[in-house]
Each structure stands twice: as structure tokens, then as C-alpha cells.
């Protein structure tokens, strides 16, 4: 429901606004409210939705104070927050709202004085106030001279809803959020802040004072303080010291297996995107942006999706040739089914095929083939059957349930799915572990299609690749890069000795996995049960709109990025980020010059490579050019009433886009991440580092934060990505992005000695009694350590040039210490034991705790600034250093 036009005054203003304190005034004002349009003080929900939603969770119990006849409570319900209780002083308006929203019994309405709330303790997670406290202050002479009675009244209400003086900021922590919007509370906060800012100006005028009292400094100091655990010595456990408070205040949200800064920022970005896509005045000249909204809205059509049920996938399976689990199937069509499943619909049974830059000739693209075909996150889940019995049973239950939902026979579905699972176990047996695939020189094999045919003769490769890359014409001499020759040879033998019915069941199972997320709630519910076992998620509370934002990001991510960038990105941030990268690059090269183990020839080549690293900040330029953006998605058709068909169209469109790349050179405009992504990456074949707009925000970066925090946040991320150019894999590529040996033998041997130290260091860390894999995480650990060192050296260089910064109030840290705390708090995280195990066996990164502890225990600068003695847990005595 819309509110009256902006700036329109309510029709019945009292002669004196102290009438706002009288219930009789409100009772009279709201006569007939059930039939009149709603009125929203300070604007309707849409005016602050993007700011509010990142602070809310769908399961929150929300209390709205002084609801009046506002549409806020109902719009919260429509926005995916169903647990809303609204109270008002006036019984007349409460009765009116109960009548107006009788069709929504979930909404609760109570007659109650906000000064005498009658709810049990801890009844609510969120309290919203928009204008009510202003009414309590009616009759004051002016907003700047509030009487002691007025202050007492506001204090009384804040106490009623749970604010505890001295223990939290006015806008609360997210553990039990009390969120007050507008009203006198914000006015009082603004007045207090104004006093602090004024005091800060005086401090700035007097150079003897070194405390920063700007609004930004006060806010960030509060966030840092509430994340710290002062009961722990920084030299005992710096992660707990930096994140203990954050962990206490951030219990794992329902439906999540992990929660950290990256998740929080992505939720925030999603809320902004939701606001943009659901804007009723959405009007874009870009066809790609219009497609984005149509795709998103089709995903939200839950009633239509439920109405269609499983039929869209059943029809697709029948079109391909049938499935032995659900009915008749064509027994002689292995190649045809493989082409449809892996080509048209982009699933990856047995292996994956893609087009990418040739590692040894990076200015050209080439067909690449690699191992694939497992549904569970890692081969370990299949092979360590005793430890993973619960997961394998849950997976088989999931397979059976989906087979039954699609028409499988009760008497045979589980037996046939067991055969598919056994085939996946055989695939896991021949799959090469990730920690044995880190030397790209060894796993890179370039050959012709005819040579590939001889290596893996169980299928017609020319026929398959020609179909996949249609309408391109291929011949037997077409080059292909194969990663893992032994795997392909063995998978070919496995195909030859497997019964056709099992092959068919496995191929269609891959298609089912790919498409069921587009089907009705029964399929989602089946998956939730598997995910609970696999990742420890207790229940799924992810609202549909968030799922749809993620789907839209996958399908039309750069068109979505265009909307995001235009709405949020500060162009000056790009210039500042580029300056920081330059400073960090300089610091890295200076450290390079001091390495005693590297010979001069290799050092010079390394410096040239560092100089040549190309940085991309924010977004690719083409997304702000409507015609160029439209061209990217030209040919992708969007149906307004079939989300399933939109996903099928996406797979088909993606296959055509891939084929189009083969005869073109790689382009720098082809980013691997969309602008709204909260992440960054280094691409060795382009020798480039990329920082999307999504990560260029607090706590990683903010223009008005101390430089210590910016260098400790986004600065370390920048140093991390730059160091990837010189980790155990990146160091194999030269400055042009080509995989070739450019190191002298002596320096290479020394490099391996230094990395062996780091590998062994991380091998010693444990999570829930399970050791980290120092080999699997080596590249990321090298980047973490090198990135921290480069960023800190860049910060010191900045200080030499600009002088010391003012310190944050109350935190009790020097700015050098603040740098390390800022770095650590970026990695504050909570995670289920099941998710922690999954990370240990699949993730090339170390767990968050050891990204902090491992890196800082190797940092002489950290140990010096915190005074950690040799023998303390943070200073074991031996430091592992590569860069």
C-alpha cells in the first residue's frame, strides 16, 4: 500500500502539538481509519527498505512501536518478515488495523502504552520505532532544549524495549537487535554526535590531542570494541582476542552453515538489489537490465512453480529419451544423451569441457577438458565410507526421494540409485586429489582431438565437441588441453565396463541435479534434508527473494551489476583503490629486492612480472554502456511465467557463448566475478588482479576510516591477490601470463624450501581434531602471509609520507596494532562442525581462525607491536616466510 504523497501533512493537526500526548486526540484522529488510506510518518517502507533489510532476518520477532495506521507492519510481512507485532496507544486504530488486515492472521495488533510495555522478557529480536518518540516529546520548546521530563520519558521507553546503558550502541548489536528508526531517539543521538564532532574539531585544532572523534571514528571504534575479547591476551590467541566478542554476538543464523563478514556483506548487497529489482518505477533503456527484472520476477512466481510441479523436468527427460528409473528409455543412445546433458544443459557427468585461455599461449583460447562428475563436495566423502556413512546414507535417501518425485517405481528406485552411487564411488577412486594437482606444468597436456580419441576411446570426441561448440567446425587436428590424462583414460575404461542402464541413470541423474532447484517446494525440501547432514544447517530460513537474487546473479550477473554500480558505487573509491594497489605493489617489490635467497636474474624477472600485473577495480566498463551490455545477453530469451524454462534457456545460451569464445582472443572485459560479488581474484593467464565493487566497502574499506583499517582490510586483500602471482602455482606463469619455466634452478630450490616450512606449519593446525592439509592450502597461505607483509609495509610508507594518524577513541590500541586487529576482524567467523569438515577437505583456503593465527605468528611486525615473547602461542620461535 502506498502512503500519501511526500510532504503532505496529516489533515487534523492539533492547535498545540502537545495533543500528541493525549490518547483522546489519537482516538478521534483515527475514527474511520479502517477505510482510509494509510499514513506513514517520515516516509513509507520503500524509503528506508534498503537500509533496514540487511539488519533483519526472516525469523526475527519484530515489535513495531506506535503503529498508527501505517502500512509498515503489512509491508514487512510482504517483504518476507512474517513475525510482526504492532502496538499503539489508541484502541481505535488498533481495532481499525485488525479489521483492515483480517486476511493476514499472522500479524498481531495490541493496544499498549509504549511507556508500559507488557511483554515477557526477550519477546522480540527487533524493535522498530518511526515517529513515536517524537510524539512523546511534543510540547518541548524546541528539539535542542529538551526538558529533563522529556529525556526521562525517552529513557524510560528505551529501557522498556531492552536498551542497557553502557553496554551497547544506540542502534544495538545484532545479537538481540533493538533498531530505532527516526524519531526523537535519533534526534538525541544526532545531538550527542554533534557534540562529539564539535569536540573533535577542537581536538583537530590542538595538535597535542591525537584522538579522532569524527562520527566515522566513533562508529568504527564501537564496532571494533564489541568484537574484541579483552579477557584473552593477544599473545595467547589473537583470533579470540580480536573476534571473541563478535562470535558471542553472532550466533549462527538458522539455515546457515557458516557466517562471516563476506556473508554479511553479500546479504547487504542482495537487499540493495532486491530494492532495485522490485521498484515499481523500474524503467531502464537497457534490454539486458529489463531481462534482469523479468528473470527475477519469474523466480518469485512461487504459485506458478508449485502449480507446474515436477512436470517440466519429466517432459525434458522424456524429450531426451527417457530414464530407466521412471519409465521406458532408449537403450542405444548413450552419445545422444551425453550430448544433451553435457552440451545443451551444461551438466558435467564424467568430465567437464570449457573454453579458456591456453596456459602456454595465453593470447588465444583453447578447448580444455578436466575431471568432474561427483555430486558430493569431495572424493573423500565417497572413499572414507566409515567416517561419512551418515552423509552417504542421506545422499542415497535424497537420490531416492527425487527419483520418486519424478515418477520412479517404489520397488526399484532405491536399488537403481544405489547403482548410480556405486558408479560415483568408482569415479571418486580415479579422481585425482586437489593437493596432487598443484603443479600445473605436470598436469597440462596439449593434444589433438584424434590423440584424445586414442586416449579415451569410449566415446566419439569429435562428434561430442562438434555438438558442444556448434556451429563451429572442428576437425581431428583441433587442439585440446587435457588436465589429468590418467583420469580420462580410466574414465573411458569405466564407461566401457558399465551397464548401459546404469550409464543412462547416471547421465539423467546429473541433469536432475542441475535442474531441480527450479522446481517446486518438494524438491527444495528434499535437498534441505541432505544439506542438514552434509553441512549441519538446522533449517532453511532463506527467503525466496534471496534465492532469486542469487539465481539472477548467476544468469545475468553483469546486467545486475550495472544496476548495483549505478546505485551504490562511489567512483572516487576506484581512484583511491588504484592508489593503494600502487603503494602495495611498491612495498612488495621493495621486499623482493631484500630477499637473500633469490638470484638477480630471477629477481629482475619477478619485478617485471609485478610491474606488469594489471589491476581491475569495481566493474568492467562495458556494463555502463547500454548497447554493449545488451549485446552480451543478446539471444537469451526470458519467459515471464516459467522460471524453469528460463533456466533451460540460460544453459543453452551459456553453451553458445562458450562456443563463441573459441576463435576469439581472451578479453580483459571478461571478468570471472560480477561487480556485486564480495570477493577478489588473481588470474594468472592475464596476470591481472580484480576487485569487484562488492568488496570495496566496510569493514574492508571506507573512505572515512583510519588508513590503518583500510590497509589492514582491503589492503591485505590486495596484497593477497598480488602475492598469488608468486605462490606455488602463480610463480609458474611469466609476466605475459604464459606457463613456462623462468626461474633459475637455485632460486626455485630455495623457494621450495621456504614453502615446505609453511606447508609443515599449517599441517600442524587442527579443527575439531582434524588436521589441515598444508599442501592443499599452500597457495592461499603464501598469499595470506605475503599480502599481510606487503600491506603493512605499504601502510608504514604511507605514514612516512603523511605522518601519524589520530587514534580511535576508547579502543586502547596504537594504529600499528589497529592494523593487525582490523586484519583479524575481517576473518571473524562461525561455522558448524560439518561445514568445518567440508572446508578442510575441499577449500584451498585455511579456516578463518588459522588465516589469522598462521599469518600473524609469521609476522615480525605483529610480534614486535604486541610484544609477544618467544615461546608464547603467537610466537613459537620459528617463522616461515616466503615473500
From Swiss-Prot:
Q: How the protein sits in the membrane?
A: Single-pass membrane protein
Mind telling me which CDD domains this protein's record contains?
AdoMet_MTases, M13
Q: Where in the cell is it found?
A: Golgi apparatus membrane; Cytoplasmic vesicle, Secretory vesicle membrane
Q: Which GO terms describe its biological process?
A: brain development; cardioblast differentiation; heart development; methylation; protein processing
The positions flagged as glycosylation sites are 279, 283, 324, 384, 429, 496, 652, 745, 753
Secretion signal span:
none
Lipid metabolism as UniProt keyword: no
Principal subcellular localization: Golgi
The entry marks the following residues as binding S-adenosyl-L-methionine, namely: 26, 30, 41, 66, 88-89, 113-114, 130
Q: Where is this region: Methyltransferase-like region?
A: 1-160
Q: Which reaction does it catalyse?
A: Hydrolysis of the 21-Trp-|-Val-22 bond in big endothelin to form endothelin 1
- Give the CC-aspect GO terms: Golgi membrane; plasma membrane; transport vesicle membrane
User: Which residue ranges does UniProt annotate as crossing the membrane?
Assistant: 179-199
Residues on the membrane's Cytoplasmic side span 1-178
- Keywords for the protein's UniProt record, in alphabetical order: Cytoplasmic vesicle, Disulfide bond, Glycoprotein, Golgi apparatus, Hydrolase, Membrane, Metal-binding, Metalloprotease, Methyltransferase, Multifunctional enzyme, Phosphoprotein, Protease, Transferase, Transmembrane, Transmembrane helix, Zinc
Documented activity regulation: Inhibited by phosphoramidon.
Residues binding Zn(2+), per UniProt: 720, 724, 780
Occurrences of domain Peptidase M13 (ranges): 211-883
Residues on the membrane's Lumenal side span 200-883
Q: Known EC number(s)?
A: 3.4.24.71, 2.1.1.-
Positions of disulphide bridges: 212-217, 235-868, 243-828, 299-548, 757-880
Family, similarity comment: In the N-terminal section; belongs to the methyltransferase superfamily.
List the protein's name: EEF1AKMT4-ECE2 readthrough transcript protein
Species source reads Homo sapiens (Human)
The gene is: EEF1AKMT4-ECE2
Amino acid at each position: 500500500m502506498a502512503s500519501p504523497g511526500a510532504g503532505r501533512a496529516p489533515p487534523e493537526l492539533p492547535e498545540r502539538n502537545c495533543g500528541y500526548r493525549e490518547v483522546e486526540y489519537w482516538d478521534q484522529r483515527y475514527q474511520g481509519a479502517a477505510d482510509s488510506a494509510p499514513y506513514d510518518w517520515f516516509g513509507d517502507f520503500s524509503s528506508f527498505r534498503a537500509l533496514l533489510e540487511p539488519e533483519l532476518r526472516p525469523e526475527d520477532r519484530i515489535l513495531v512501536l506506535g503503529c498508527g495506521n501505517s502500512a509498515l507492519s503489512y509491508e514487512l510481512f510482504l517483504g518476507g518478515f512474517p513475525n510482526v507485532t504492532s502496538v499503539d496507544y489508541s484502541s481505535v486504530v488498533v481495532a481499525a488495523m485488525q479489521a483492515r488486515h483480517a486476511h493476514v492472521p499472522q500479524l498481531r495488533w495490541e493496544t499498549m502504552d509504549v511507556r508500559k510495555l507488557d511483554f515477557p522478557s526477550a519477546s522480540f529480536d527487533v524493535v522498530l520505532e518511526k515517529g513515536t518518540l517524537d510524539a512523546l516529546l511534543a510540547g518541548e520548546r524546541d528539539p535542542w532544549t529538551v526538558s529533563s521530563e522529556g529525556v526521562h520519558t525517552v529513557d524510560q521507553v528505551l529501557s522498556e524495549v531492552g536498551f542497557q546503558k553502557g553496554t551497547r550502541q544506540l542502534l544495538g548489536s545484532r545479537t538481540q537487535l533493538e533498531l530505532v528508526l527516526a524519531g526523537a531517539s535519533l534526534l538525541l543521538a544526532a545531538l550527542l554526535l554533534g557534540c562529539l564532532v564539535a569536540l573533535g574539531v577542537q581536538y583537530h585544532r590542538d595538535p597535542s590531542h591525537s584522538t579522532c572523534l569524527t562520527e566515522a571514528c566513533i562508529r568504527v571504534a564501537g564496532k571494533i570494541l564489541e568484537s574484541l575479547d579483552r579477557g584473552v591476551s593477544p599473545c595467547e590467541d589473537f583470533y579470540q582476542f580480536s573476534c571473541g566478542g563478535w562470535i558471542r554476538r553472532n550466533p549462527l543464523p538458522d539455515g546457515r552453515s557458516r557466517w562471516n563478514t563476506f556473508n554479511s556483506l553479500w546479504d547487504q548487497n542482495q537487499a540493495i538489489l532486491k530494492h532495485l529489482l522490485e521498484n515499481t518505477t523500474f524503467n531502464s533503456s537497457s534490454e539486458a537490465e529489463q531481462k534482469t527484472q523479468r528473470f527475477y520476477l519469474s523466480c518469485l512466481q512461487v504459485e506458478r512453480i508449485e502449480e507446474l510441479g515436477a512436470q517440466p523436468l519429466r517432459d525434458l527427460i522424456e524429450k531426451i529419451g527417457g530414464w530407466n528409473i521412471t519409465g521406458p528409455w532408449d537403450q542405444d543412445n548413450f552419445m545422444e544423451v551425453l550430448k544433451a546433458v553435457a552440451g545443451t544443459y551444461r551438466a558435467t557427468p564424467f568430465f567437464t569441457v570449457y573454453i579458456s585461455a591456453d596456459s602456454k599461449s595465453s593470447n588465444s583460447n583453447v578447448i580444455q577438458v578436466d575431471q568432474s562428475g561427483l555430486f558430493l563436495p569431495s572424493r573423500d566423502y565417497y572413499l572414507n565410507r566409515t567416517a561419512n556413512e551418515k552423509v552417504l546414507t542421506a545422499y542415497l535417501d535424497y537420490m531416492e526421494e527425487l527419483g520418486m518425485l519424478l515418477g520412479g517405481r517404489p520397488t526399484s528406485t532405491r536399488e537403481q540409485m544405489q547403482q548410480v552411487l556405486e558408479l560415483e564411488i568408482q569415479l571418486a577412486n580415479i579422481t585425482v586429489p586437489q593437493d596432487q594437482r598443484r603443479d600445473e606444468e605436470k598436469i597440462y597436456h596439449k593434444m589433438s582431438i584424434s590423440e584424445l580419441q586414442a586416449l579415451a576411446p569410449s566415446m566419439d570426441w569429435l562428434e561430442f565437441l562438434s555438438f558442444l561448440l556448434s556451429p563451429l567446425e572442428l576437425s581431428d587436428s583441433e587442439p585440446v588441453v587435457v588436465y589429468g590424462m590418467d583420469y580420462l583414460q580410466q574414465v573411458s575404461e569405466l564407461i566401457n565396463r558399465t551397464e548401459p542402464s546404469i550409464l543412462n541413470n547416471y547421465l539423467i541423474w546429473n541433469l536432475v541435479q542441475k535442474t531441480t532447484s527450479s522446481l517446486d517446494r518438494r524438491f527444495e525440501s528434499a535437498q534441505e534434508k541432505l544439506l542438514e547432514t552434509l553441512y549441519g544447517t538446522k533449517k532453511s530460513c532463506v527467503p525466496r527473494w534471496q534465492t532469486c537474487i542469487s539465481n539472477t546473479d548467476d544468469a545475468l550477473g553483469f546486467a545486475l551489476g550495472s544496476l548495483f554500480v549505478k546505485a551504490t558505487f562511489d567512483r572516487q573509491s576506484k581512484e583511491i583503490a588504484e592508489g593503494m594497489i600502487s603503494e602495495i605493489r611498491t612495498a612488495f617489490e621493495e621486499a623482493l629486492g631484500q630477499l637473500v635467497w633469490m638470484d638477480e636474474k630471477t629477481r629482475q624477472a619477478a619485478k617485471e612480472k609485478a610491474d606488469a600485473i594489471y589491476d581491475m577495480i569495481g566493474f568492467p566498463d562495458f556494463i555502463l554502456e547500454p548497447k554493449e551490455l545488451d549485446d552480451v545477453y543478446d539471444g537469451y530469451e526470458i519467459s515471464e511465467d516459467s522460471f524453469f524454462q528460463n533456466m533451460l534457456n540460460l544453459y543453452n545460451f551459456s553453451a553458445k557463448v562458450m562456443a563463441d569464445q573459441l576463435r576469439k582472443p581472451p578479453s580483459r572485459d571478461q571478468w570471472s566475478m560480477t561487480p556485486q560479488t564480495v570477493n577478489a581474484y588473481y588470474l594468472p593467464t592475464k596476470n591481472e588482479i580484480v576487485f569487484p565493487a562488492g568488496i570495496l566497502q566496510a569493514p574492508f574499506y571506507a573512505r572515512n576510516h583510519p588508513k590503518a583499517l583500510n590497509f589492514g582490510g582491503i589492503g591485505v586483500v590486495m596484497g593477497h591477490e598480488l602475492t598469488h602471482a608468486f605462490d606455488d602455482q602463480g610463480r609458474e606463469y611469466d609476466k605475459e601470463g604464459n606457463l613456462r619455466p623462468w626461474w633459475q634452478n637455485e632460486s626455485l630450490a630455495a623457494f621450495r624450501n621456504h614453502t615446505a616450512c609453511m606447508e609443515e606449519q599449517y599441517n600442524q593446525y587442527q579443527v575439531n581434531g582434524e588436521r589441515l592439509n598444508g599442501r592443499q592450502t599452500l597457495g592461499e597461505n603464501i598469499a595470506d602471509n605475503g599480502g599481510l607483509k606487503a600491506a603493512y609495509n605499504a601502510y608504514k610508507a604511507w605514514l612516512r609520507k603523511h605522518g601519524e594518524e589520530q587514534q580511535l577513541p576508547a579502543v586502547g590500541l596504537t594504529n600499528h596494532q589497529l592494523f593487525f586487529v582490523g586484519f583479524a576482524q575481517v576473518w571473524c567467523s562461525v561455522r558448524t562442525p560439518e561445514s568445518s569438515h567440508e572446508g578442510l577437505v575441499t577449500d584451498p583456503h585455511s579456516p578463518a581462525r588459522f588465516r589469522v593465527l598462521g599469518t600473524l605468528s609469521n609476522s615480525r611486525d605483529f610480534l614486535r607491536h604486541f610484544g609477544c615473547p618467544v615461546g608464547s602461542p603467537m610466537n613459537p620461535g620459528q617463522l616461515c616466510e616466503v615473500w
